[in-house]
């Protein structure tokens, strides 16, 4: 229903959600948490934004600049548009609520479109960027940007990054990462320049 063409792609499971491929073969992966299905849903929606961008590239221009993705900035804009805007809208939850009721055999006030929409917009600080809410997600990006500037400017050495990360995270989010896995090492995208 989001427009992903499964005849030109597929969805699989992995440790961390990602997508990639060519316009005629785009692969999406996600992870599942049986205690919180919403994280999986939003991960799939985010990766679907990437996949739709790839599937929309002109196949006839493959191998030429005009047929290539314009970079990670545009890629992320498309995925975040799907995740943070289109699929957190009341219209989306009006579509989704009956599907949830049918697939999970649930009913009650917490499963109405309005309740699902409110739940998706809760502001709760999270150590993990890809699980962040729509307000704190940009703070994750700003934190990385500031630390990158300090590293590149010579004001921070790599060995001090975990401490600098934890201090800056606590200052911005009000919570302190308990370990590097939920701190400076939690995001594979940061190290590959995305």
Task: State what each model feature region is.
Residues 88-192:
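Long, amphipathic alpha-helical stalk/connector segments used for oligomerization, subunit docking
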Residues 2, 6, 52-56, 60, ...:
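A generic secondary-structure signal for well-formed alpha-helical elements
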Residues 16-22, 65-75:
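Beta-rich nucleic-acid/ligand-interaction surfaces
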Residues 29-34, 60-71:
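Short helix/strand-bridging catalytic loops that position acidic/His residues to coordinate divalent metals
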Residues 39-59, 76-83, 147:
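Active-site recognition of the HExxH zinc-binding catalytic motif
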Residues 1-37:
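Contiguous, non-catalytic segments that form substrate-binding/exosite surfaces or channel walls
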Residues 15-27, 51-58, 113-122, 177-184:
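Active-site-adjacent bridging/hinge elements
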């Amino acid at each position: 229903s989001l427009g992903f063409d499964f005849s030109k792609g597929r969805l699989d499971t992995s440790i961390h959600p990602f997508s990639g491929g060519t316009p005629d073969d785009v692969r999406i992966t996600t992870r599942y948490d049986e205690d919180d299905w919403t994280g999986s849903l939003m991960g799939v929606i985010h990766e679907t934004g990437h996949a739709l961008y790839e599937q929309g590239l002109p196949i006839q221009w493959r191998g030429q600049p005009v047929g290539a993705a314009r970079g990670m900035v545009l890629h992320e804009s498309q995925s975040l548009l799907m995740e943070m805007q289109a699929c957190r809208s009341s219209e989306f939850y009006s579509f989704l609520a009956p599907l949830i009721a049918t697939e999970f055999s649930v009913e009650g006030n917490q499963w109405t479109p309005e309740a699902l929409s409110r739940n998706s917009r809760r502001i709760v600080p999270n150590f993990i960027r890809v699980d962040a809410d729509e307000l704190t997600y940009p703070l994750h990006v700003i934190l990385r940007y500031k630390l990158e500037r300090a590293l590149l400017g010579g004001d921070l050495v790599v060995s001090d990054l975990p401490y600098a990360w934890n201090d800056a995270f606590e200052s911005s989010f009000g919570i302190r990462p308990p370990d590097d896995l939920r701190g400076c090492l939690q995001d594979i995208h940061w190290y590959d320049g995305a």
